[in-house]
Amino acid sequence: MRTVPGSGQERPSYLHRTLSLLAVLALFQGMADAIRAHALTDHRVLVLLLALYTSLVVLAVLVLTVRRQRALVRVDLAVLLAGFLRFAAMFIATVGSHQQTYRDDEGPLVTLAARALVTGGHVYGRHWPHFAQQFGVSTTPLMNGRFADSFSYPPLSALLAAPFVNTLPSWVPLLGLFAFAGLSATALFMFRALPVQLRPAATLICFGMSWYLFYVRNGYPVFLALPFLAVAVHRWTRTGAGGVLGRQGVVSALCLGVGASAHQLGWFLAPFLLAGILLARRGELPWRRALLVTGRWAAIALGAFLLVNLPFMIRDGTAWLGGIGNVLTQHATPQGLGPIDISYYLTSGTGDLGMYSYAAALLLVASLVALLLYPRRLAPALALLPWPAFLLAPRSPETYFVLLAPLWLLAFASCPQEDYQRLWQWRPRLLADRRFRLALPALLGLPALLCLVAAVASPVPLRMDISTVRTATAADGGSSAVTALTVKLTNTSDAVLVPHFASSNNAWASFDWKVASGPSMLAPGGSGTYRLIRRTSPSTTAGATGRTYLRVLTDNPQTLTSAVIPPGRMSTTG
């Protein structure tokens, strides 16, 4: 008896079985360690993890043995449920009255903003200078020696948290629960929206990647945006097809507006999505109709964004505008996984950190222009194109890339592949020249490259001479750590500099230093001797290199000067 394609009675393909098996294997990550960790501490979590571990073995067998496509889809759904329960068990294991509520600053700042909203106070333009001590979390240090202590996200997270923030026990990570709900909704939507053979990727990406747990647990607002952005990019090549938005187009626009009200990363996706929709519609419609339907879509998205933000625009005025853009304008200290590491690790610093920001902005513009010029080649990567530019920024952690990974696959795989070849492609005479066509991508990236070279090559503005160094054994009984030192700085630049000090023996810098003596600023050509004392007892840090660096940062202009604290000058004290 012949089977009808698409009926679910046909045999699964090797690709489908392979992806399903990879999804199961990904869920084994960390299971054994988690089971051992809770063997004597939390029997409820232990029983759940043991049951899941056993079920994963059974599901792996079923993946390779079921005979029909429909049966494998049901197994995939069971694997998705197992992934959800595994993630939930590991999440629950980190929650309790004896546990720290959050371990990073995003959740506490959103919590404080929600409390301010409930009491009728201002949300934007308000500072909470003691929130780090209140919640026991680390902070985001700034180039001016301070730290980020205000709510610097669009308001959706605070709006959602406000009804619950004063009713739940203080140890419940409310923002973590919202983030988990957002990730789960994204996984379920991906499973429903992806082609049948790719549905295991929903489990693999959302629940099988170990990096998500930390960020979800600590309530990163980007997970509130994720399900809305997923709906926005779903079948984007068909948005406004025939010049009519329809229900799918309206929902897509609304979700983009709401997603942009949850996190700023949605702002960077929006112009690429707008350009892609315009090119898709121009491929089938005259310019006027293509612009009209795309304009209606953009207007609905903007209207949804403004509607969510309207109460804060009225209440906080200009502070609202500065607040939602503060993450982009604040001068956070350098840290990341891109070219900034050249100045941070490989050289003694840079005299112009701002050039990294210019390089990132120019590459972002170049990526958008490249999409407009080569849509049929680049449109499959539309949801990925905004993020390479972030590699060039002074602060380029992995959160800008991997947390939005579900969008990369969904935007590509949910669109009919033939749609990419129907996109309108501008072909001016210059692009008819093969040599110019080959050289154009390099020309688009040249301004960003020049800024990057300028940032790396800019000489450091300070000359350092480290003299007296005092160390002490770390509080946890580890190796010795620097507790005080004396350093002479000479300003070799033509700008007035206000130095701020940090030290590091791994990827993270410690700003736990007090200037006991020394001038507050250095004039061009001026010198000053600074005596630095660590405020708290040092502790052994994971990933320590054995060498300790002194980092001197200035904010205006943004500069970084680094030097190794010579180990030969250290004298250990008790």
Placement of each model-derived feature along the sequence:
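Primarily membrane-embedded glycan-assembly and transfer machineries that use lipid-linked glycans
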Residues: 2-233, 237-241, 280-389, 393-397, ...
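Short aromatic-acidic-glycine turn motif
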Residues: 505-515
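Short, intrinsically disordered terminal tails adjacent to the first/last structured region
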Residues: 1-12, 422, 426, 440-450, ...
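Membrane-interface alpha helices of multi-pass inner-membrane proteins
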Residues: 207-213, 229-230, 247-275, 307, ...
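Internal/C-terminal transmembrane anchor helices
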Residues: 78-92, 429-459
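Hydrophobic/aromatic-rich transmembrane helices and adjacent perimembrane loops
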Residues: 44-54, 224, 268, 397-431
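Short acidic/polar inter-strand loop motif in beta-rich domains
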Residues: 553-562
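Membrane-proximal bilayer-interacting regions
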Residues: 346, 350-356, 373, 417-445
